[in-house]
């Protein structure tokens, strides 16, 4: 804001969609409050890019009529997701920044009724040449994840994950 007020051109480059867990809305509010003209160039959010690159549809006529994007952590540490609603069938759940709370996410979903056999995947370094997909069942997710290291990852949970080539490659191991 300070640089723009001094007449300089300012670019805020954000990977993905700046309005999906990117704080774009907060930044726009600050610019509007300061009376600074701006332009937002939309990007492709990680959920869309990573799922497509991994061969995981977010929706499917027979498997998931909806998808929901969630932060793995909430701004207020005392806040919580509606786990009962998230455990309902027929949806794909995509958690951004959720790997540090992977155990809690898996436990809460299963405790609220999501089947332990539900397909789940972590897409590491999505859409990059180094992309890796770890696909398994929800009940095995926590045990299998540590072997993949502390890279950035997007967590996808739902029946559409079974369509991923990575899930299909080892269905008995999944």
Positions of PLM-derived features:
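Short glycine-cluster motifs
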Residues: 2-73
């Amino acid at each position: 804001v300070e640089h723009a007020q001094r007449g300089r051109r300012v670019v805020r480059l954000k990977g993905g969609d700046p309005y999906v867990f990117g704080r774009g809305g907060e930044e726009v509010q600050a610019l509007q409050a300061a009376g600074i003209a701006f332009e937002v160039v939309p990007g492709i959010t990680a959920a869309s890019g990573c799922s497509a690159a991994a061969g995981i549809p977010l929706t499917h006529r027979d498997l998931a009529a909806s998808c929901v994007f969630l932060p793995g952590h909430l701004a207020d540490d005392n806040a919580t997701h509606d786990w009962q609603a998230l455990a309902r069938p027929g949806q794909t759940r995509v958690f951004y920044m959720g790997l540090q709370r992977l155990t809690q996410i898996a436990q809460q979903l299963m405790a609220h009724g999501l089947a332990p056999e539900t397909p789940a995947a972590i897409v590491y370094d999505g859409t990059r040449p180094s992309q890796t997909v770890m696909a398994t069942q929800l009940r095995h997710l926590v045990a299998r994840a540590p072997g993949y290291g502390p890279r950035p990852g997007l967590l996808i949970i739902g029946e559409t994950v079974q369509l991923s080539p990575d899930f299909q490659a080892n269905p008995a191991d999944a």
